[in-house]
Amino acid sequence: MLNISSSDVESYKENGFVVSEGHLSTELFNEILQAYNEFIDKNNDLSLEEMASPHLMNGAGLKHNKSKELCESFLNIGKNNEIVSQVMKILGDDVILWGMHCMHKEAKTGKKIPWHQDGTYWPIEPKATCSVWIAITDVDENNGCMKFIPKSHKLGVLPHLQEDKVTNDGELKGSLDLKIDEKSFDENESINCIIKKGQAS
């Protein structure tokens, strides 16, 4: 089971991220994997941005190929107490699920997500929120793991630039359209988020 300890909560507040010590239960992990695979199989032509809100029939105005039952599967995952109980340890008892996203990065596609702060994409004030990222495969520096810059959340919202997502030859070179101005942070301070399938950060 996932388990965020009191020391993990303090680490989250200090560093801006935490990796769960435990793993999702086999039942919940299989439920996520089944919903994820069905969604990807039906929508494999979509960009990363277009894979937002799989729990809503008309999420973000996107035209997903999905059934009402699949939406309900994602919604039930997002409301699952195994996940929500850990979020409550960080944010408190009054929490809502306001978004979900399937991040599908196929091998050898080169879809790099630029350095960013999640809050720049969220029209929410105050930004008393957190992301729960669940790995469905083992992830390390060799297959595109996330990276964090410890304590950068204490710097407030850093300047972001609009990223040109298309190369001169017309190829898509990345995902998401905002990136932190390189003058605002030191990438050498980053930490690789290496986790096993079924873990969460």
Ranges and model annotations:
Residues 117-120, 133-134, 187-189:
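Glycine-rich, charged/polar anion/phosphate-binding loops
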